[in-house]
Amino acid sequence: MANYRVLVSDPISEKGVEALAAAPGISVDVKTGISFDAKTGKPTEEFLKLIPEYHGLVVRSETKVTAEVFAAAKNLKIIGRAGVGVDNIDRSAATDHGVIVMNTPTGNTISTAEHAFTLMLATARNIGPAHAEVLKGNFKAARKAYQGIELNGKRLAVIGMGRIGTEFAKRAQSFNMHVVAYDPFLSQARADQLKVEL
């Protein structure tokens, strides 16, 4: 028999649900789309009646965990935010009710850096416009007008050298780009370590 019940109130990966369910002493219920009424901007009555049964809550962005939710959640011990920000969780109310709030700050770091780098590469090589011309059958126009530029040897400015900016800079350096960084919190020693110019 499970000692702790966890409610997953927003869609998350099936693998995440399976990992929770596999943990000893935990039962997991997935009930998405019931937590928040976008018209009223408040938690639904259904959610407020349901939440007292649970010890844990897993959310993404849809569920708004307000002071009203915490007041109803008599057994809640922990909230896991499957994502970076916790702006949809009233952290002051969480503290008042002794509920731990956790997030996954590095969950999308690599994906975001890769996506941004892919967009830069596609822009430099004119992938979008060239593809559109090829679909129209204009092969010669695509070849001449959309040759693009090489990233090799170019200077790249990165604004913000947090987790994502750092990963983005690493990808640029692998293309032999010279990275110039702006970040008021980045020390010269850390910039040297990352091989970026301040």
Could you tell me what each predicted segment is?
Residues 11-14, 62, 183-188:
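Short, polar loop motifs at secondary-structure junctions
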Residues 44-47, 66, 147, 195-196:
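Acidic, amphipathic alpha-helical patches
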Residues 144-198:
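Rossmann-like dinucleotide/phosphate-binding beta-alpha-beta segment
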Residues 1-54:
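N-terminal glycine-/charge-rich "phosphate-binding" loop or analogous flexible N-terminal tail
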Residues 16-22, 71, 89-96, 186-194:
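Short loop/helix-cap segments at secondary-structure boundaries that form the rim of catalytic
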Residues 3, 76, 152-155:
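Phosphate-coordination loops involved in phosphoryl transfer and adenosine-cofactor binding
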Residues 7, 35, 40, 55-135, ...:
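Phosphate/diphosphate ligand-binding glycine-rich loop within oxidoreductases
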Residues 29-41, 60-61, 136-144, 193-198:
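Short gly/ser/thr-rich secondary-structure transition/capping motifs
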